[in-house]
């Protein structure tokens, strides 16, 4: 049977992680269908149809799908589920909210946060904050799976021409009401998809000292991250948190400043292509995953680093 991928979008365009999820889903079965639920989401459906790995797009539109509530989405998914052996979406906030509800309604066990597809019924997922990996075999006839997007390359975004079909919308779930959405507006790259991330930890000592991180991030056109310790201390807002309970990032360059390297933080960044650590404690666990380490006082090292960047007189693009 086919694989149903629940596409994430903003009613106008696909979210970037959907491309990673498509790659993963196509490794389960090449007969891959994308489900686009929303309101006036024709552009997103068209974008999904242009993905070469997608064989068919199913779109469901109604005003009560505007804000992507799992309570409204899940009946649509379960109604279509009979035609599919696997139901897949990203293991981000969207997927973690939706998929448990879908799995419960289908009376099946969810396989969460997979990083590798071994076969149609066997998958690899991290456990113990990424310090070990479990190979999981699902014997359920219908499998509900969430995928860690950063573990898979994004698929090609053009060249396909999948047909678009329309399915009937369900009734609105009235016990849950959308109140509002507050989005953080920034000129910086989005943390989850940035090529360069500069993160600060408890060693920054205060929120004001994060201005050092900001100055360097400005020169590198980088996203700003933080450890949970820095967030809990109130140095920076939690939308910057990297780690097991924050965002998982896989940038080309990750600069960790004043971060000791608790396993929860390492779980969110240790797959970065190049890791640079700056910490005055030479025994800090962060050095165990770093490609380059500088044992130094960050309040001396960062101004020197910024001075050298200023000499280049350029901002990375």
Segments (PLM) and residue ranges:
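N-terminal glycine-rich FAD/FM-binding segment characteristic of electron-transfer flavoproteins
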Residues: 1-317
């Amino acid at each position: 049977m086919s694989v149903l991928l629940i596409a994430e979008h903003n009613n106008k365009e696909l979210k970037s992680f959907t491309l990673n999820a498509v790659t993963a889903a196509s490794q389960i079965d090449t007969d891959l269908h994308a489900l686009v639920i929303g309101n006036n989401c024709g552009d997103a459906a068209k974008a999904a149809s242009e993905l070469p790995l997608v064989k068919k797009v199913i779109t469901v539109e109604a005003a009560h799908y505007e804000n992507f509530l799992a309570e409204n989405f899940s009946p649509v998914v379960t109604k279509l589920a009979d035609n599919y052996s696997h139901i897949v979406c990203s293991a981000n906030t969207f997927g973690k909210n939706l998929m448990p509800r879908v799995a419960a309604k289908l009376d099946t066990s969810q396989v969460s946060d997979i990083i590798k597809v071994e076969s149609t019924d066997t998958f690899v997922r991290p456990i113990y904050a990424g310090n070990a990996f479990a190979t999981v075999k699902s014997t359920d006839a219908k499998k509900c799976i969430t995928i860690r997007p950063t573990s898979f390359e994004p698929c090609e975004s053009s060249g396909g021409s999948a047909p678009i079909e329309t399915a009937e919308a369900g009734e609105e779930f009235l016990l849950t009401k959308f109140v509002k959405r507050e989005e953080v507006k920034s000129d910086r790259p989005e943390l989850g998809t940035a090529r360069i991330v500069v993160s600060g930890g408890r060693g920054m000592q205060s929120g004001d000292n994060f201005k050092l991180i900001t100055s360097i991030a400005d020169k590198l056109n980088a996203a700003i991250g933080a450890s949970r310790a820095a967030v809990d201390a109130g140095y920076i807002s939690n939308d910057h948190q990297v780690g097991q309970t924050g965002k998982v990032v896989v940038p080309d360059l990750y600069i960790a400043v004043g971060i000791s390297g608790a396993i929860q933080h390492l779980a969110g960044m240790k797959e970065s292509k190049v890791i640079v650590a700056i910490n005055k404690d030479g025994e800090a666990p962060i050095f165990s995953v770093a490609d380059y380490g500088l044992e130094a006082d960050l309040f001396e090292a960062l101004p020197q680093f910024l001075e050298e960047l200023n000499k280049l007189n350029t901002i990375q693009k």
